[in-house]
Regions:
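Short, thiol/selenol-centered motifs that function as redox-active sites or metal-ligating centers
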Residues: 66-75
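C-terminal binding/interaction regions
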Residues: 1-31, 60, 86-165
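Alpha-helical support elements that line or immediately flank enzyme active sites
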Residues: 75-87
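Structured beta-strand/loop patches that form or line metal/cofactor-binding pockets in enzymes
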Residues: 23-65
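Active-site phosphate/pyrophosphate-handling residues
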Residues: 48, 77, 130
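Glycine-rich phosphate/pyrophosphate-binding beta-alpha loops
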Residues: 42, 70, 128
Length: 165
């Protein structure tokens, strides 16, 4: 997202985020889940559970549940839409690009994020980056089958499980 974006463009981004907060996609439980993980941020109260039905390296279905701020829920909703039906490798790559945009190592226009670009402005608010990445953190732990390790608050940089010490 261009930091010098016109007010109309910024309003559009805000509308996308609020739409996903009000009516989150893929919200609910997934009893037949093959992978699960939970991400919590005790400092703000965000708490997101991600459940996946994975077969042959593909996310056949995804659900998330929990509670959190508008950014947390909207990000988890957009994440769910973006990875539903996709291969695990795609989900990992998208998470890396999204995290790169929020942490400033990748420009939004270079990341090919689709609707997720509407959350790029979060990078201007460092305390909210964890909110936008919490669902993704849980997703990466679910994919890595590390549900127990995602139970605690995520590290500051929200590195995926394979990159954490």
């Amino acid at each position: 997202m261009n930091p010098d974006a016109a007010p109309v463009e910024l309003d559009l981004y805000q509308d996308v985020v609020m739409d996903h907060k009000r009516a989150p996609r893929h919200f609910g439980t997934l009893p037949e889940a093959t992978h699960r993980a939970r991400g919590r941020n005790p400092s703000c109260g965000d708490d997101v559970q991600v459940a996946l039905d994975v077969a042959q390296g593909r996310i056949r279905d995804i659900r998330f549940s929990g509670q959190g701020c508008a950014i947390c829920i909207a990000s988890a909703s957009m994440m769910s839409e973006a990875v539903h039906g996709k291969e695990l490798a795609f989900a990992r790559d998208l998470q890396q690009r999204f995290r790169g945009v929020l942490t400033g190592t990748l420009e939004p226009e270079d990341a090919a994020l689709g609707k997720l670009v509407s959350l790029a402005g979060v990078r201007n608010y460092p305390s909210r980056i964890k909110c936008a990445l919490l669902g993704w953190h849980a997703l990466m732990h679910a994919i890595a089958d590390q549900a127990d390790k995602a139970e605690s608050a995520a590290p500051a940089d929200m590195a995926p499980p394979e990159q954490q010490p």
